[in-house]
Every structure is written in C-alpha cells, then in structure tokens.
Amino acid sequence: KINKSFKAITALSMFYDLPNPNQFLLDIKKILATDGIFILEQVDLLSIVKEQLFDTICHEHLEYYSSKIIIEIAKNNHLRVFDLKKNDINGGSITYYICHENAKFKTNLKKINNIVKEENRLKLEKINTYKKLEKNIIQQKIKLISLIKKIIKDGKIIHGYGASTKGNVLLQYFKITNKFIKYIADRN
C-alpha cells in the first residue's frame, strides 16, 4: 500500500494492456495529489481507423479506446480529462492530461470537442467503420504481396532489418513467409 501522493503520474503505451482499466484509474485517483496530473498516452481508436494502423493491433493489447471513452472512463472514476494532445508516437497517438474531477485545471473544451466530433464523424461506434477498415487492409495486403512478387520475379532478394512488433504483425497478417523474405535481422 502506498501512503504518499504524487503530483505527476505517467502511463505510456500501456493502458490498452490492462485487464481492469477502471480499477487502474481508481488506484491512480488514490495516489494522485489534489493538484496532480496523470498523463496517459496511447494509440487511440481514431488514429487506428483514420491512419489504418492495423499493425499496432496485437495479442498484448486487450482493447483500444476512443477519446470519448477515455473521457467517460475517467469521469466514472471521479477524474477529468482537462486537455489532450495528438502526436505521431506509434503512427498516431493521443496524450491525455487527467486530474481529479474538482481540480482547478481549466478544461480545453475546444480541443477535446474537436477530437470527439472527428470520432463521431468517422462513426467509431458503428461496425461498418471496421468492415471498411478491414477492406482497406486487405487492399494494402494485395498491393504489398504483388510488389514483393514482382521484386522476386525480377531476380532480386528481399531482406528485412528490424523485427518490431508492428513488423511481425504485418508479416503474420499478410502471411509473408520466408518464401518471400529470406532473412530478417534485428539489433537490440
């Protein structure tokens, strides 16, 4: 048990790994100072759909959240998203600035509302949005496999360097085997 409070707490690229995000936020609330800030950064659902970031979807990520849902989960746990910032981490992420619900931080309603409006415009709550995403990913797969086959047909050999999670997701989902790429190396 922690008997201290903290003015700054961060959770970077891990919120979607949590089996119980509500309990996590309750725990954050308990240790966050009255005037403290909790900084949460993650690939968001808007970026996944808009930028077709399928390669970030893997077994360790239990779920993905829209900003609308992050705001709601925070509110349900007596916290408040008072600002957010889009960034290019992992192809597209959002950093959320969260405080206690009654903290004196001014809420950047304009920025928050703009993100939520964009999420609503893209219909993140509708299944057809994800069916369209799937079709686009299949088209990417067809194009990439065609390019790889052309390169091989031209007598060239493809080698890979950098075996990141994203690279492995792409290789597995597109079924790119050693038939296409003979060697992949990585350096840690």
Task: Describe each PLM feature range.
Residues 91-136, 140:
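Flexible, glycine-/basic-rich loop-and-beta segments that form/coincide
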Residues 79-90:
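Conserved S-adenosyl-L-methionine
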Residues 40-63, 67-69, 74:
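Short, glycine-/aromatic-enriched active-site segment of Class I SAM-dependent methyltransferases
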Residues 2, 146-188:
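A solvent-exposed beta-alpha-beta segment
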Residues 22-39:
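A short glycine-rich, Lys/Arg-flanked "PGG" loop and its adjoining helix->strand segment in the class I
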Residues 7-11:
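A conserved beta-strand element that flanks and buttresses the S-adenosyl-L-methionine
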Residues 14:
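Hydrophobic adenine-recognition pocket in adenosine-nucleotide-binding enzymes
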Residues 23, 53-57, 175-178:
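Short secondary-structure boundary/capping segments
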